[in-house]
Amino acid sequence: AIVCDGSGHGLDGKVWGGEIIVNGKREGHLEEQVVPGATSAVLYPKKMLFGILGNFMSAGEISKVAGIAPDECHVLEKQVAENFNCIRTTSTGRIFDAASALLGFCSKRTYDGRPAMLLEANSTKPLDVSLKTKANVLLTTPLFEYLVENIDRDKSCLAATVQQYIAEGMHKIAAQYKKPIVFSGGCAYNRIMVEYMVSKGAYVNEKVPAGDGGLSFGQAAFCAPKQQNPADM
């Protein structure tokens, strides 16, 4: 299964949201990225963007490229250096949020999923970019290096490139296991990702919601047999 979402509690104590699960075991995922400000970065995606760009740019460079005030960049830089109020995540949603902020579509989330939805809404045709993986980890830092290097190109093409990169990369890793692939999670409402997965023969949600509703349904289905035999709980 390819599971792409905004936030989920990982078995390692970190925040998951871009995972490949095979026979109940995590076999692959998106690159871990630092999230300065933890939950506040969900509301202000430029914080997430800073965390990613900080892998290959200085605070001064980030300020110019991302449109973040120099003083705020200094604070975020210190925060990351001291690991103060920072978390680590493999979330697909946070990647989409950061890309949406970089491309100028959304700098503040005023409702659930807004940055990612605007990224999708402003997407046209993806550009060609090489997938970068390492030990079943889809690297997202090179994706943002590409975006920065090509920032003057059509923003709608760059937006589509982000979503296509994640879809192709996650499918490539999952396909190694020679098993039927299921694509689900909150990001399985994303048209670009769904169309790619379906074109590759992956199964997607039809009768059960892909997001929180499907999660609740799955929990109920898992617990129902145990309710009949409380000794198993």
Model-derived features with residue positions:
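Acidic, glycine-enriched active-site microenvironments
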Residues: 1-233
